[in-house]
Regions:
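Active-/binding-site microenvironments in catalytic and ligand-binding cores
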Residues: 1-158
Length: 158
């Protein structure tokens, strides 16, 4: 259990859903948080809303590209000491990535270098609809040993 922060990047950029490959930079994250009147603190879980999940609910094929966290944004969140970062998309990070020579660079920055958890396929629309930017984030522990990923059901309490 910790504090959750939702950044509505679709509203920040004025487009929903955001286009594939749109990367959230450190400057974008700072500006979006300021615009929403929230701060990101050590120990927070930060979720991003791009409109990706809602726009793709009725599709039968996985869309190959998506908006998401960029490398400077990932480094910024890690420097702040967040516990986890998540988004309403299947990979959290922008695809195609900013650097086409690296596979999933944001995953490498957050998970491998800084130990920041990644949350994918987060349902953020209800929080956006209610205008929520801050909430209590509750996440149970899956009863799996030795796994590197799991299906979880987090709860946002407003």
């Amino acid at each position: 259990m910790t504090r959750g922060v939702l950044l509505n990047m679709a509203k920040f950029y004025g487009q929903e859903p955001l286009p594939a490959g749109k990367a959230y930079t450190q400057a974008d994250i700072k500006a979006a948080a300021k615009k929403q009147g929230v701060s990101i603190q050590k120990g927070d879980v930060v979720l991003f809303h791009s409109g990706y999940m809602t726009a793709n609910l009725d599709k039968t094929e996985l869309v190959p590209g998506q908006p998401g966290l960029g490398t400077s944004g990932a480094e910024y969140l890690a420097q702040l000491g967040v516990v986890a970062a998540g988004a309403d998309s299947w990979a959290l990070e922008a695809l195609p990535s900013e650097d086409h020579t690296q596979a999933f660079p944001v995953h490498q920055i957050l998970l491998a270098r800084h130990g920041v958890y990644i949350l994918e396929n987060m349902v953020t629309q209800a929080l956006v609809d209610d205008g929520v930017s801050e909430f209590m984030f509750v996440l149970g522990v899956p009863k799996l040993e030795g796994a590197v990923q799991a299906i979880i059901n987090p709860i946002a309490i407003r």
